[in-house]
């Protein structure tokens, strides 16, 4: 008869990775939704609105979204022209979908809106309408509904947990700004166009990642309060 192995001497198996711990049903606005990404200089001060790109998409909850890109040109430093184009397009969407919430991931977008509105101005009533419509997915959605075993400060890990497949490597805000600065230093229009296309693609990916997290929360979250 063979001896039983000593449990104390057995080699430990792989530790189980903790999963999501749901705290409450996700409290998310109804469709339609406008997904929003604003990219600016991550090292800028509160009034340094070095906005170089915007990504947005109207989502009715059914069909696939069509990301829109508003990117900087190279004629003027700072973000005035990007901001003016964004305000024009956002005004059209606010008029057409007055009840839609504008979903962004972290507090960065609200800070950019406030800084650019202060620096460059807005049409009467625009700032109040947009600020009222903003909905931060991280603080008002993710952190109120679920505890995750990862860093939630950026969307990358959260979206991956939700099943979204990212490109590799991710550009990130610092990478996008670095590419834009290199393009500003270049006189080659082909290089500049390529950089702006890369930035627009990265913003579109962020929009789709937010959508994936949103749908994951709706599908996987509890219907009743937990605990």
PLM features: what roles do these ranges have?
Residues 1-32, 36:
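N-terminal accessory regions of nucleic-acid-interacting proteins
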Residues 158-227:
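Acidic, Mg2+-coordinating catalytic module of metal-dependent nucleases/exonucleases
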Residues 36, 57-59, 103-106, 202, ...:
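Generic beta-strand/beta-sheet core signal
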Residues 66-177:
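Conserved DEDDh/DEDDy metal-dependent 3′-5′ exonuclease domain
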Residues 26-33, 38-85:
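Metal-dependent catalytic core segments for phosphate chemistry
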Residues 37, 137, 206:
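Acidic active-site catalytic centers that drive phospho-/nucleotidyl reactions
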Residues 28-31, 48-52, 95-99, 160, ...:
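Short, well-ordered loop/turn elements at secondary-structure boundaries
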Residues 20-25, 39-45, 88-92, 99:
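Generic recognition of flexible, low-complexity loop/linker segments
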């Amino acid at each position: 008869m063979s001896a039983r192995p000593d449990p104390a001497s057995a080699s430990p198996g792989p530790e189980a990775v903790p999963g999501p711990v749901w705290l409450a049903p996700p409290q998310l606005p109804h469709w339609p939704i406008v997904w929003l990404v604003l990219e600016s200089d991550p090292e800028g001060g509160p009034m340094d609105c070095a906005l170089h790109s915007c990504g947005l998409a109207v989502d009715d909850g059914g069909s696939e979204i069509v990301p829109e890109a508003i990117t900087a040109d190279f004629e003027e430093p700072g973000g005035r022209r990007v901001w003016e184009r964004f305000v024009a397009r956002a005004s059209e969407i606010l008029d057409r979908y007055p009840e839609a919430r504008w979903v962004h991931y972290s507090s960065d977008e609200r800070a950019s809106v406030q800084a650019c509105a202060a620096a460059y101005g807005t049409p009467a009533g625009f700032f109040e309408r947009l600020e009222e419509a903003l909905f931060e997915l991280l603080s008002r959605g993710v952190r109120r509904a679920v505890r995750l075993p990862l860093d939630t400060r950026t969307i990358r890990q959260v979206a991956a947990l939700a099943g979204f497949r990212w490109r590799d490597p991710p550009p990130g805000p610092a990478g996008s700004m670095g590419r834009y600065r290199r393009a500003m230093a270049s006189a080659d229009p082909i290089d500049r166009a390529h950089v702006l296309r890369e930035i627009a693609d990265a913003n579109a990916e962020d929009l789709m990642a937010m959508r994936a997290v949103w749908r994951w929360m709706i599908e996987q979250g509890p219907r009743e309060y937990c605990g």
